[in-house]
């Protein structure tokens, strides 16, 4: 089994598994930021474009540069957001574009915990913001706030203890308010503030819950993909028994992200 590698390559599969929730969190994140209009934005790790689209629709930007190291994600986002205001680039956190005078706002959605060196990445972002500019990000609260993943890993590890190191909760200690605040403060940002952002995640049926785990994109789907058919069947059965549907057959859960923001000194 080689499920320790987080496979984030396939845009369509990501949309089914996580993208739909990412879009809703992106809206709440921007409502919290309340950014000034006509700003020049840089997005680090745009993925399939959930936050990119929200910035374009809700923040009235002058320009948006959205970058991601995955060519497949950049292609997916570019094809779904055809807008002259937005420029997509293939670039990682260690090779960020620059703008003369600096960007007004730099954001990163659901990315920081997957970076090899988050402190270096945040310092790099800070170095590309103008004085008085805003740096903000958000990550999933894997340890306590992502119910559909928390339940998945609880049952997966009960069946297969060797899966425990793949569980995003213990894997990503950065995804906690105190750790995020420390990360931003140590990067030299001022007025650092964290915020919880929570949405409902409703699945019409158990199959609607289970099917996205079969896409092979993301840590949990990558793990499922590594299992043989019998092991998948056992895990599916445990999850069905664990998840109590509502009277209409739907499964109603919640997902929480943790937002973090800070300013570059004027």
Kindly label every feature range from the protein language model.
Residues 3-7, 22, 48-50, 170-266:
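Conserved Class I S-adenosyl-L-methionine
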Residues 8-20:
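Class I SAM-dependent methyltransferase Rossmann-like catalytic core
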Residues 20-39:
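Conserved alpha-helix/loop element of class I SAM-dependent methyltransferases that forms part
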Residues 33-35, 59, 81, 129:
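A generic alpha-to-beta junction signature in SAM-dependent methyltransferases
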Residues 40-96, 120:
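Class I SAM-dependent methyltransferase SAM/SAH-binding core
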Residues 94-106:
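A short acidic, Gly/Pro-enriched loop at the edge of an enzyme's catalytic core
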Residues 104-118, 141:
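A short SAM/SAH-binding and catalytic strip from SAM-dependent methyltransferases
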Residues 119, 126-130, 134-204, 220, ...:
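Conserved catalytic/acceptor-binding region of the Class I
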């Amino acid at each position: 089994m080689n499920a320790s590698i987080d496979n984030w390559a396939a845009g369509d599969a990501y949309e089914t598994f996580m993208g739909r929730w990412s879009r809703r969190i992106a809206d709440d994140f921007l409502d919290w930021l309340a950014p000034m209009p006509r700003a020049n934005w840089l997005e680090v790790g745009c993925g399939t474009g959930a936050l990119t689209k929200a910035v374009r629709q809700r923040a009235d930007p002058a320009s948006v540069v959205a970058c991601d190291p995955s060519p497949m994600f950049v292609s997916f986002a570019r094809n779904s957001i055809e807008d002259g205001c937005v420029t997509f680039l293939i670039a990682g956190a260690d090779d960020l574009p620059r703008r003369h005078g600096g960007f007004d706002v730099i954001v990163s959605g659901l990315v920081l915990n997957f970076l090899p060196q988050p402190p270096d990445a945040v310092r790099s972002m800070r170095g590309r913001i103008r004085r008085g500019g805003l740096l903000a990000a958000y990550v999933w609260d894997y340890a306590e706030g992502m119910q559909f993943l928390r339940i998945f890993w609880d049952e997966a590890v009960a069946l297969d203890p060797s899966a425990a190191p793949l569980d995003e909760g213990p894997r990503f200690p950065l995804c906690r308010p105190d750790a995020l605040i420390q990360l931003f403060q140590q990067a030299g940002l001022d007025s650092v503030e964290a915020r919880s952002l929570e949405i409902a995640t409703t699945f019409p049926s158990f199959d609607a819950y289970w099917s996205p785990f079969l896409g092979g994109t993301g840590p949990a789907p990558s793990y499922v993909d590594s299992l043989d058919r019998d092991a998948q069947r056992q895990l599916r059965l445990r999850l069905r028994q664990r998840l109590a549907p509502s009277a209409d057959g739907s499964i109603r859960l919640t997902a929480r992200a943790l937002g973090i923001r800070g300013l570059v000194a004027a």
